[in-house]
Design a protein with these regions (language model features):
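Single transmembrane alpha-helix segments in multi-pass membrane proteins
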Residues: 2-6, 20-73, 107-114, 245-262, ...
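Transmembrane helix-bundle core of multi-pass membrane transporters
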Residues: 88, 112, 116-179, 205-208, ...
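Transmembrane alpha-helical segments in multi-pass inner-membrane proteins
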Residues: 217, 228, 232-294
């Protein structure tokens, strides 16, 4: 509503050169990689976990994708002609690395029994350094029109990143609703001990969700590097873990595990992107955006805490007792 008031044409969509354009389409495109990561984060949080390494995993995937395009050469910074490396090879390399990162986190958490925030903190720090090692600390450019289309291209007039985000949502929705995985995730996050006694291999469930968020992060890294036609390992996916967590909690998923909502996460991601877009168009310094996002996370966590729920329950019980008196 704020955007609509100050920019009356915010929701207008036009067709130019066969493409859908407008502020709304740009918002959906920019929200796509954040939504993809947030969907994976939803499943992780549903198992009572957390992953703060998603930005670094995106950086690793993006760096390896560009490095594959360049044939592993970082000795020159400018592009040297159009690359002919097959797109499928680029994607396989990037997503395989991202999946391995997720597997690493999953093993540390499920097998080694390290706390999720500590386990993913390891890769958050080391992963960013690893991505910078891949690129030699440089911003690597490339020329590969097919790969670039994943970030700036369109299918049937709609930006490709939107298709990728919708496809990711549908795939995760199908996996969690048409297979037992969704129920296993909820039972693992709701009561891991009871779930384990009932025969659920909670270790495998946790490893699966961390591999899934690794793949989501890798796909986001591909979109990021395809969008700007370069790889800057120091900034790919920077702070996106905060945005993903915020989208999940705004969407109604409980940080205590168990209950989750993929549809709610979609709404949360769009709200976050709208907020970012609004602040940028109003020339608000980026540091205030980060402060606001962190504040919302803290407030939501407080509201979801057992102490607040206990106080709310007691207050509701007193009101009911008075009404019956």
């Amino acid at each position: 509503l704020f955007n609509l008031y100050f920019t009356p044409g915010f929701f207008e969509i036009e067709i130019k050169d066969g493409r859908l354009t407008g502020s709304l389409m740009d918002l959906l495109k920019r929200a796509s990689p954040r939504l993809i990561i947030a969907l994976g984060m939803t499943l992780v949080i549903a198992t009572e976990g957390i992953d703060i390494s998603v930005g670094s995993i995106a950086a690793i995937a993006g760096a390896l994708a560009v490095l594959t395009i360049r044939g592993g050469d970082i000795t020159y910074l400018a592009t040297q002609g159009t690359s002919t490396v097959p797109l499928i090879l680029i994607i396989v390399v990037a997503l395989s690395a991202a999946a391995l990162c997720g597997l690493f986190n999953g093993i540390l958490i499920a097998i080694v029994k390290i706390q999720p925030i500590i386990a993913t903190l390891i890769l958050m720090v080391a992963g960013r350094g690893l991505a910078m090692l891949f690129t030699g600390g440089y911003v690597l450019n490339y020329d590969h029109p097919t790969y670039e289309s994943l970030g700036v291209g369109d299918w049937f007039g709609v930006p490709v990143p939107i298709f990728l985000a919708v496809g990711t949502f549908l795939l995760i929705w199908l996996v969690t609703t048409r297979t037992p995985l969704g129920l296993l995730i909820q039972s693992t996050g709701g009561n891991e001990t009871a779930s384990r006694y009932s025969g659920t291999n909670t270790k495998v469930v946790k490893i699966i969700v961390y591999v899934m968020i690794g793949l989501c992060s890798g796909l986001a890294g591909i979109i990021f590097t395809a969008d700007v036609q370069s790889a800057d390992a120091a900034f790919i996916g920077l702070w996106i873990e905060l945005e993903a967590i915020l989208a999940v909690v705004i969407g109604g998923t409980a940080m205590t595990g168990g209950r989750y909502s993929l549809a709610g996460t979609v709404v949360g991601a769009l709200i976050i992107q709208t907020l970012i877009t609004t602040l940028l168009t109003r020339a608000v310094p980026v540091q205030y955006t980060l402060i606001f996002q962190a504040s919302v996370v803290v407030i939501v966590l407080i509201l979801q805490s057992s102490k607040v729920k206990e106080l709310a329950f007691k207050r509701r019980a007193k009101k009911e007792a008075r009404s019956h008196a």
